Amino acid sequence: MTSPRRALVLVDVQLQYFSGPLEIHHPPHADSLPRITATIDAAEAAGIPIAVVQHSSGDQAPVFNPTMPEFALHPDVEARRRPEWKAITKRFSSVFAETQLLAWLRAADVDTVTFVGYMTNNCIIASAVAAEELGIDVEVLSDATGAINLANSAGFASAKTVHSTLMALLQSNLAAVAASGDWAAAVEAGQPLPKDNLPTSAVAGVARSARQAGQ
């Protein structure tokens, strides 16, 4: 089995997500942030290259405004930042859209990106989808990402529902999903994370639905 050539991508671990209407609620950022920093430490120890991404909506925007304090990285991430990290500022949901990330990954001979950060329901899912056509394998760490509560004209979904649903969706086709501790063990062993696929997920979904209907 070929060992993945990984890069860790820190997606928008910005202060914008730690208070206000965009505050991460599941997993709570009090839980996910320590998992993010532990993953950074594990990547550094293993010599895995790191890219740090910040979202900007422009200096007239009410959120993700680079002139406002909330644009900054969380201090626990900023304190670990090293000059060799690749710094990316994006304006679209995907970390690949109109950024230098792909070129940096190619130059480093990376074939697998590990995503941690926020939000599961926007930039993580968008980036995982974009990676497919680029031929980049994706890992998403379920306890080092997070979602918000959502309500709009189409309905309501709690952050827990959003996050757990998207983890199952990602694992079914677009990514290998795991907890940060399992990822660290896979890194140490030089192994890829296990990944399911759409047909087996569909078969298992039918069986699970039938069992629940029979209860």
Regions found by a protein language model. Give the residues of each.
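Glycine-centered flexibility motif
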Residues: 2, 20-21, 58
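Active-site-adjacent betaalpha module
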Residues: 1-7, 34-46, 63-215
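Von Willebrand factor
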Residues: 43-58
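Short acidic, Gly/Ser-rich segments with clustered Asp/Glu that frequently serve as metal-coordination loops
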Residues: 14-19
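N-terminal nucleotide-binding beta1-loop-alpha1 segment
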Residues: 8-13
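Short glycine-enriched, charge-decorated loop/helix-capping segments at active-site entrances
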Residues: 22-29, 61-64, 155-156
